[in-house]
Amino acid sequence: MQVILLDKVVNLGGLGDIVKVKDGYARNFLIPTGAARRATASAKAEFEAKRVELEKQAAEKLAAAQQLGEKLNGVNVKLTQKAGVDGRLFGSVTNADIAEELTKAGFAVAKSQVRLVNGPIKTVGDATVVVALHTDVSVEVTVSVYGDHS
């Protein structure tokens, strides 16, 4: 199926690109999330009419993500979890926990934007996580996990 991309999609293309993708990928992901439309003649004409507005919106999203990235870069998030004497946590620190702490600190971050490269954090100490604010903007945040031995 051919689709017109309405937003930048990683490993696929940018705004306005007409790409051929598998039918299921288009029907189940790209079209429902608003990232693409079917590439019909009427959709192409409608897209060209709205192209300037869509490019402006994309530039605004990128600028907002870059601004948040500058504030967020190098931030240290402190979390306290129950832990054993050997430093292992009872449970783990997930992307949802980190996103919740960042939101409490005043940064609008969704849990889907927090990338834990090595999986959930299961030990006491510092870990570096990546926060992907936009397809072009990602920053590193340090997470300090402290053990609560009570």
UniProtKB/Swiss-Prot annotation:
InterPro entries: Ribosomal_bL9, Ribosomal_bL9/RNase_H1_N, Ribosomal_bL9_bac/chp, Ribosomal_bL9_C, Ribosomal_bL9_C_sf, Ribosomal_bL9_N, Ribosomal_bL9_N_sf. GO terms for cellular component: ribonucleoprotein complex; ribosome. Keywords: Ribonucleoprotein, Ribosomal protein, RNA-binding, rRNA-binding. GO terms for molecular function: rRNA binding; structural constituent of ribosome. Pfam families: Ribosomal_L9_C, Ribosomal_L9_N. Binds to the 23S rRNA. Belongs to the bacterial ribosomal protein bL9 family. SUPFAM superfamilies: L9 N-domain-like, Ribosomal protein L9 C-domain. The keyword Ribonucleoprotein applies. GO terms for biological process: translation. This is Large ribosomal subunit protein bL9.
